[in-house]
């Protein structure tokens, strides 16, 4: 009997599986509405002028290809912090934010989930209903039980505000709550500033751990406007997690341009947290 005789065929990814089916389809009139990528009229992913210029500069430098630091390119990490929290954020000046480059937003979520499993091994993870499918898979793979909180009301095509707050209030202290910071995937229905304040109040009162996921900064109302939820939580004094992705922003889907940011209570705490996050990264892909 082969070592792999009992291995079952895994189901296709609900999103990327559609792309595989599209590529296998021989019809010339097909349209790909599966994977969320921007294509021009020829069906190709355009390369942004800024990316072309950056690549040209980079190639001309003939830079060496040595190992990056475990937490990635320092200038990139700092730029991510400024985009998320604002260049003048007191949190940055106080050293209360650590940021590590990640393999896309998925990689940032994976790092965060693995680190949280060390911190809160018995926690429950709550994700919105509906949510990006990989949220459940990532946290379940890390060993967490995952449940839903009500979010979208199909009848009104709006947020189920009462249901969401009721479900968050019912979570035990120490539960991890995954929140879409902007451009909710898959509904596109976002919380208002007042909604975010209500969610923050519940999170603080119940002692929940917020994990904000932001893959579309700038695609909603603007760069700063889309970061409003992150900055609101930053002003609250809470410790929390932010996974961010710029793969779509730069039209560099295959480059996996992500980052994980963690907000701590002090510069000294940041140093300890970063040391442990780097260990998680090292055992994943560094």
Give, region by region, the residue ranges found by the protein language model.
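Short acidic (Asp/Glu) and glycine-rich catalytic loops that position anionic groups and cofactors
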Residues: 31-35, 58-61, 145-146, 211, ...
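Short catalytic/ligand-binding loop motif for oxyanion handling, primarily in non-cytosolic enzymes
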Residues: 39-43, 186-187, 251-252
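Short beta-strand segments
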Residues: 34, 180, 244
């Amino acid at each position: 009997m082969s070592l792999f005789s009992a291995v079952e065929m895994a189901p296709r990814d609900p999103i990327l599986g559609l792309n595989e089916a599209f590529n296998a389809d021989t019809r010339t009139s097909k349209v790909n509405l599966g994977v969320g990528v921007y294509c021009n009229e020829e069906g190709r992913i355009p390369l942004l002028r800024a990316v072309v210029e950056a690549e040209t500069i980079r190639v001309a430098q003939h830079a060496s290809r040595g190992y990056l630091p475990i937490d990635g390119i320092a200038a990139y990490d700092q730029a991510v912090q400024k985009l998320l929290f604002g260049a003048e954020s007191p949190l940055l000046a106080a050293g209360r934010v650590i940021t590590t480059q990640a393999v896309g937003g998925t990689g940032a979520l994976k790092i965060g989930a693995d680190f949280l499993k060390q911190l809160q091994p018995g926690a429950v993870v709550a994700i919105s209903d509906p949510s990006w499918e990989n949220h459940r898979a990532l946290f379940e793979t890390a060993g967490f039980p995952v449940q839903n909180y009500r979010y979208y009301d199909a009848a009104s095509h709006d947020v189920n505000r009462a249901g969401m707050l009721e479900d968050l209030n019912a979570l035990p202290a120490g539960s991890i709550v995954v929140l879409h910071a902007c451009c909710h995937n898959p509904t596109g229905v976002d919380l208002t500033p007042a909604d975010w304040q209500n969610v923050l109040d519940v999170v603080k009162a119940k002692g929940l751990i917020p994990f904000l996921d932001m893959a579309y900064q700038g695609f909603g109302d603007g760069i700063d406007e889309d970061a409003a939820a992150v900055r609101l939580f930053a002003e609250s004094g809470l410790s929390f997690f932010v996974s961010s992705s710029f793969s779509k922003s730069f039209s560099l889907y295959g480059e996996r341009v992500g980052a994980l940011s963690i907000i701590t209570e002090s510069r000294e705490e940041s140093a300890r947290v970063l040391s442990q996050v780097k260990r998680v990264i090292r055992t994943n892909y560094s």
